[in-house]
A protein has these predicted regions:
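Charged DNA-binding/catalytic regions of mobile-element recombinases
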Residues: 1-275
């Protein structure tokens, strides 16, 4: 230390004090510009209470871009949300069930469509059943049907098939084979449904029994729909739910940031592909 002190031209006692001085605790970082984003972040969190900071960041940047303002880094949004207690509680539970290593994602749209049925239980005990079909690549829900008090029928699935083909191809027959992935429920496996699918150019594919993971795209959508829509809206009875469902599906397709699409919505992704 004497040699270093001589080279630097300072007293040894001063150098010793600098080396052994306790490091001052670093205060929390607070950038003035962060506070300008806080009202926007609070509003988005109030509107989307199930969204984590990455999806909130996507929505923040969507609004900033519309106003011609520069994007906010996700770390900045995280910092603001953490400082103001707006972060979601981290999930620490183990994922139940077996792991699935099969490939469920395809490389372009209109190669595989995934279909499934799920239920929403209303506060009065009534049950709404929903059948839907979603594209495995761009994640847009192509068609859906909802009923209360009854099960999903084969005719509903066939209507779904026709609506999806008409939406994507503007005709009643797909120009190439499209896989239709579902479970082994009777509405999907009925002979009339299989024959109808073939006439439309669809190729029915079925997951193994008791393996919902094999239809991972559809399974993930059901979790998203229940978490981000059904659980945060009033569900007093079936009539109320049925009145809201169309708006939920449209919001998912148009606005929901999807991690598999780079945090943009399915329709934003489709529009980006078309340009």
């Amino acid at each position: 230390m004497k040699t270093i002190a001589n080279v630097l031209g300072v007293a040894r006692s001063h150098l010793h004090e600098r080396v052994h001085r306790p490091t001052a605790a670093r205060g929390s970082y607070c950038k003035a510009a962060d506070e300008e984003l806080l009202p926007l972040i609070r509003r988005l969190v109030d509107e989307r209470p199930t969204y984590g900071y990455r999806r909130v960041t996507a929505l923040v940047n969507r609004e900033l871009a519309a106003e011609g303002q520069p994007a906010a880094n996700h770390k900045r949004v995280f910092r603001i949300m953490k400082r103001h207690g707006l972060l979601l509680q981290r999930h620490t539970g183990r994922r139940k069930g077996r792991l699935h290593d099969g490939k469920v994602v395809v490389m372009r749209s209109n190669l595989r469509w995934c279909s499934d049925v799920f239920e929403i239980t209303c506060w009065n005990g009534e049950i709404v059943r929903i059948v839907f079909v979603i594209d495995a690549h761009d994640r847009e829900v192509l068609a859906w049907h909802a009923v209360a008090g009854v099960g999903v029928s084969g005719s509903m699935v066939r209507d779904l098939m026709l609506e999806a083909v008409e939406l994507r191809f503007a005709t009643i027959q797909a120009p190439h084979a499209v896989e239709w992935l579902s479970d082994n429920g009777s509405p999907f496996t009925a002979k009339e449904t299989l024959d109808f699918a073939a006439a439309l150019g669809l190729v029915p594919c079925f997951t193994p029994v008791r393996s919902p993971e094999s239809n991972g795209i559809a399974e993930a959508f059901v979790k998203t729909f229940k978490r981000d829509y059904a659980r945060i809206h009033p569900l007093p009875d079936a009539a109320t739910v049925l009145r809201q469902i169309a708006r939920w599906f449209d919001d998912y397709n148009e606005s929901h940031p999807h991690s598999g699409l780079g945090m943009i919505s399915p329709r934003e992704f489709i529009r980006a592909q078309a340009t």
